[in-house]
Amino acid sequence: HVIPPAVAKAGMDTGAARRPIIDMEGYIQSLKARMDPTAAIMQGIHARARQAQARMIFAEGDEPRVLRAAVAWQRGGMGQALVVGREAEVRDQLEAAGMGDALREITVVNAANSRHLETYHEFLYSRLQRRGVDREDVLKLANRDRHVFAALMLAHGHGDGLVTGATRKNAPVLAQLGQVFDLRPQ
């Protein structure tokens, strides 16, 4: 994807080109789309994501891969990255990955300090009380399980999307999410 645009630019610079390319970036994107059909699909997805400016919740804030994804989301102009975790741990992981400056860009959400925690507890208790879960268990679940806390954020509109499951297999994560959302098809 580098050589054809360079040839076109050289042709314009030397006067050999019949028509100048006004939008070089658009020309490069159209070449990529012709050479790789999946690139066109991904470009459309990225364009829609940038336009929507979604608040994406990243549940596993102590995982380096997740933090890199959150920073890429934020820096890529996709929207706001909300990372669930303890600020000190997130800072240490970012510094270890060489991205210490990214802490100013992302938003770290700690379950223990959330002002919405009481609302989350009441919501989760209303869902789980008939399954034999008492209030104390609900408090522990919402405070300690980052997947459940992130799902509660999403359920209450404090985020637009959720990225989770990087450190566990799908089934246990879906089981945790099932405590907040109805996962069965209607």
Model-predicted regions and their roles:
Residues 18-21, 25, 29-186:
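Anion-binding alpha/beta catalytic cores of soluble intermediary-metabolism enzymes, centered on
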Residues 1-17:
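Adenosine-phosphate binding glycine-rich loop
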